[in-house]
Amino acid sequence: MKVWTIANQKGGVGKTTSVASLAGALAKRGKRVLMIDTDPHASLGYYLGVDSEEVPGSLFDVFVAHNHLTKELVKSHIVPTLVDGLDLLPSTMALATLDRALGHQEGMGLVLRNLLALVADEYDVAIVDCPPVLGVLMVNALAASQHIVIPVQTEFLAIKGLERMVKTMEIMGRSKKTRYSYTVVPTMFDKRTKASPAALQVLSEQYGESLWRDVIPVDTKFRDASLAHLPASHYASGCRGVKAYERLLDFLLAGEFGHVKIG
């Protein structure tokens, strides 16, 4: 099972949209996909029509039981979405208390990796929606991942967020004696503005080797798809945003980014 984490320490850059869009594109190709929402705001669940307050269990409950994980326990907290082949391990606001409640316990940084190993034979790909805050959840998301996708809105404030994210991975990589493989993905690109092309140029200059050589354009169909609780691939399959995520998926599946590592 492939494991990808979608992460950035700035909100509003397209993380949740990227998770839903990549997962939807994979489902269109007949792949079994597990999405894991590690953000206490539970945006991914709401996007896909899963109310975090109505689910019988959540990722928080799995963390609480981290010393007694079984495949059956993990599967009992996974819920289906409206799309065949797309499942979700949902978040709740209780995750916001995780650092205070359990963060000091030994082994808490590997809970997500361990739970994914238990269901690895059930799915082709797992995609993690990462919170923007550095803590136990982000540590888990990065540790569990084989590759990290960093969506960056093509505007200058978002580039500052990218700098913090890369610095975080560098620090964590050194402390854990590991190396993180990542790709920077320009999102919300609007060629009609001066800001988007200018920001893209800066990204190319600063992150050339790790930058995906394409963009995710601004597309109102993403908002419409979330209203319908569907990935855009299952709502407006011909739109330019969906086609861009199809190209990104091809890139990720090809695995041509192995040389881009930090740590």
Regions found by a protein language model. Give the residues of each.
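P-loop NTP-binding core
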Residues: 1-263
